[in-house]
Amino acid sequence: MSFDRPEIYSAPVLQGESPNDDDNTEIIKSFKNFILEFRLDSQFIYRDQLRNNILVKNYSLTVNMEHLIGYNEDIYKKLSDEPSDIIPLFETAITQVAKRISILSRAQSANNNDKDPENTSMDTDSLLLNSLPTFQLILNSNANQIPLRDLDSEHVSKIVRLSGIIISTSVLSSRATYLSIMCRNCRHTTSITINNFNSITGNTVSLPRSCLSTIESESSMANESNIGDESTKKNCGPDPYIIIHESSKFIDQQFLKLQEIPELVPVGEMPRNLTMTCDRYLTNKVIPGTRVTIVGIYSIYNSKNGAGSGRSGGGNGGSGVAIRTPYIKILGIQSDVETSSIWNSVTMFTEEEEEEFLQLSRNPKLYEILTNSIAPSIFGNEDIKKAIVCLLMGGSKKILPDGMRLRGDINVLLLGDPGTAKSQLLKFVEKVSPIAVYTSGKGSSAAGLTASVQRDPMTREFYLEGGAMVLADGGVVCIDEFDKMRDEDRVAIHEAMEQQTISIAKAGITTVLNSRTSVLAAANPIYGRYDDLKSPGDNIDFQTTILSRFDMIFIVKDDHNEERDISIANHVINIHTGNANAMQNQQEENGSEISIEKMKRYITYCRLKCAPRLSPQAAEKLSSNFVTIRKQLLINELESTERSSIPITIRQLEAIIRITESLAKLELSPIAQERHVDEAIRLFQASTMDAASQDPIGGLNQASGTSLSEIRRFEQELKRRLPIGWSTSYQTLRREFVDTHRFSQLALDKALYALEKHETIQLRHQGQNIYRSGV
């Protein structure tokens, strides 16, 4: 019988050369000396750490492996090469030192209180021997990280350091370390100590098949007489022992699944994952979506579902003996974003880098430099690039006194014609953001974006597996083809975009995952291209609920402009002939652009070091401008006699605040000034307000000279020309009004569109026939 998962086991079939007791004693002595004697700058860090942990009843010790190299390279080499044998000895040494420290501390305390030190010492010794458990060794290391896909047979049973994303965590399970068993017939009790360090779930425990008291009595009787008396023997039957749970000892154990970081997965490859196990004080340290750095032992175990198992026919024989499944026995885990691999390269700032970033922040043209550095291969779209700079910087997160959180991340939607470089901008953001996940709307489901509940094939237990919004926690999610998503899948990210959490209540699992990400989405209008003769509501196939969660909405049009077309054509030709690279290198040398790596480091530095707040003058200016924006939207809605499909609510005021804070953050300014507010309002006017006010009737078209008054005059002429119940053809109206130069072609189309919306006319036969149906 076993308290561990029965599917996985290990058995020492071939005993190798094991160190004798003298060697073990020497190793334990070396570790004890290291704990007691190692110091940095006259401070005994491990002795003090152990004393503090004992006071708070934290029975663990965190050791930096680099300190072992400087103290004793031999024990460091033994620990690295034979961790499964050496770590239990290290933990024994820690426990012995802890007992010694506790005894000395209590004796000193007793002397200070004038008590009998001998009696106190004896009582304390016996108490500590029974109360202090075995301490856990937790390792930290600065060794080079090994990519997940580079782990091979050479690393088996060695300590490795690797990084990745936690995609699933199991519930805590209990693992027995000491079993107290009792015979159900004669009440004989005994105990079993379980050494389960080497296995993923501990060695399978087999209880004695017969009563040990019966065996002992038979042995003693055989010594007294050669002839045994059958009547005096006990017969407790087979398998008589039961486990006494109250007297047994257990430790916590948890299973994790680690996946490669998306940025490090080679093109065309699937991200790989690896099972991990941790126990005691390393459990419940991370949640799905956390980026971690792991120090652990790369080991293998025999899986029941592997080759040669009973399901494939043949019991446990065949190839199942040779083929093992790898796993990591965790010895140390760092779960902060700043210590994960992708941030590790950008958060270790040297003094020279910090000085360089401070000088860069004082550059009055920094805003333009960062804008020019965003996708330099794409011509134009300056406002969109500025919005992306704000998205990468982000605003300031706030926690209110009542515990409510206000997001600081900025969401941007690019909506427009094909061929306007929307996808290229998304790809560039994925490259320049320290943490980014790129996905396409058609290939993304609600579970793939948020989180899904999976069933472990071995244990049949349910566990959570994080989606794109969870894996990109602390970064950016780029969603291309946003309009191709199903409505029910798009609704799933509402909570993630505003509250920045994902609530799960599936299969008995109820939890909340963090999703502190910015969303950069790209979409096409309903008809493929944006139709100027239709309102934004007819062009945009999104609900108001999702649109209100975007801080900036850009409508990107492919307008026909000869001068602009010439500039774009020359830019594209330079890219294909290689001249653009030379120009970009020259601009980087001149300081008008910065490299991707430098920009990534500067963005990370700004996000870590700066959290601006609004000045009183900036806050007052924001408030008055928001009232003006709302009033302007109301006037537009009254003129068009319909509500805008792009809402301007209090969320948009918070959006302008976040944009203002991001503009101050890129300058490392702790206070957002009025000039930041002016630029934030200009960006908001150029994006969301421009999209909301794009009415086919009320707007002005400077290229054709069409105005609202011309459209109104045409409506009056058409009502006089066409009585109720009459019809005419589109070509007839064009000959009468356009060919005679009385009205423009655009005025004709807009007027017909407006009259149809007001149900004054009906367009039949694909718009070729106009029927007057109302007033």
Curated annotation (Swiss-Prot):
Residues forming the motif Arginine finger are 548-551
Q: What's a GO biological-process term for it?
A: DNA replication initiation
Q: Which UniProt keywords apply?
A: ATP-binding, Cell cycle, DNA replication, DNA-binding, Helicase, Hydrolase, Nucleotide-binding, Nucleus
Q: Where in the cell is it found?
A: Nucleus
Q: Which intervals of the chain form a coiled coil? A: none
The question of whether Nucleotide-binding is a record keyword is answered with: yes
Q: Where primarily located?
A: nucleus
Which InterPro entries does its entry note?
Answer: MCM, MCM5, MCM5_C, MCM_CS, MCM_dom, MCM_lid, MCM_N, MCM_OB
Residues reported to bind ATP: G416, D417, P418, G419, T420, A421, K422, S423
EC code: 3.6.4.12
Q: Which SMART domains match?
A: MCM
Q: Which reaction does it catalyse?
A: ATP + H2O = ADP + phosphate + H(+)
Molecular function in Gene Ontology:
ATP binding; ATP hydrolysis activity; chromatin binding; DNA replication origin binding; helicase activity
- UniProt-annotated stretches for the region Disordered: 1-22
**Can you cite an annotated GO cellular component?**
CMG complex
Q: Which residues form the MCM domain?
A: 366-573
The text of the family note is: Belongs to the MCM family.
Annotated PANTHER family:
DNA REPLICATION LICENSING FACTOR MCM FAMILY MEMBER (PTHR11630), DNA REPLICATION LICENSING FACTOR MCM5 (PTHR11630:SF42)
* Assembly behavior: Component of the MCM2-7 complex. The complex forms a toroidal hexameric ring with the proposed subunit order MCM2-MCM6-MCM4-MCM7-MCM3-MCM5; loaded onto DNA, forms a head-head double hexamer. Interacts with CSM1.
**Function recorded in the entry:** Acts as a component of the MCM2-7 complex (MCM complex) which is the putative replicative helicase essential for 'once per cell cycle' DNA replication initiation and elongation in eukaryotic cells. The active ATPase sites in the MCM2-7 ring are formed through the interaction surfaces of two neighboring subunits such that a critical structure of a conserved arginine finger motif is provided in trans relative to the ATP-binding site of the Walker A box of the adjacent subunit.
**Miscellaneous notes for this chain?**
Present with 10300 molecules/cell in log phase SD medium.
Protein name per UniProt: Minichromosome maintenance protein 5
Organism of this sequence: Saccharomyces cerevisiae (strain ATCC 204508 / S288c) (Baker's yeast)
